[in-house]
């Protein structure tokens, strides 16, 4: 894991087209601004995990439906 130190207003560039800027720090929370192309999904980790669980459940449901027709 790469660890970087940034101050408010400073940024990190990922690849050629993703920019993450530190907007603020308050207590143990950091506000980040993320500039990325529209075709790049950006989610908080807990939201991403929920999306992955929903996709897994849907694929399992599809598998059960396929089994019924065999």
UniProtKB/Swiss-Prot annotation:
Q: What is this protein called?
A: Translational regulator CsrA 2
Q: Which domain of life is it from?
A: Bacteria
A GO-annotated cellular component = cytosol
User: Which GO BP terms apply?
Assistant: mRNA catabolic process; negative regulation of translational initiation; positive regulation of translational initiation; regulation of carbohydrate metabolic process
Tell me where it resides.
Cytoplasm
Print the keywords alphabetically: Activator, Cytoplasm, Repressor, RNA-binding, Translation regulation
Q: Which GO terms describe its molecular function?
A: mRNA 5'-UTR binding
Family, similarity comment = Belongs to the CsrA/RsmA family.
Q: What does this protein do?
A: A key translational regulator that binds mRNA to regulate translation initiation and/or mRNA stability. Mediates global changes in gene expression, shifting from rapid growth to stress survival by linking envelope stress, the stringent response and the catabolite repression systems. Usually binds in the 5'-UTR; binding at or near the Shine-Dalgarno sequence prevents ribosome-binding, repressing translation, binding elsewhere in the 5'-UTR can activate translation and/or stabilize the mRNA. Its function is antagonized by small RNA(s).
Q: Which species expresses this protein natively?
A: Coxiella burnetii (strain RSA 493 / Nine Mile phase I)
Assembly and interactions? Homodimer; the beta-strands of each monomer intercalate to form a hydrophobic core, while the alpha-helices form wings that extend away from the core.
Q: What is its main location?
A: cytoplasm
Tell me which Pfam families the record gives: CsrA (PF02599)
What parts of the sequence cross the membrane?
none
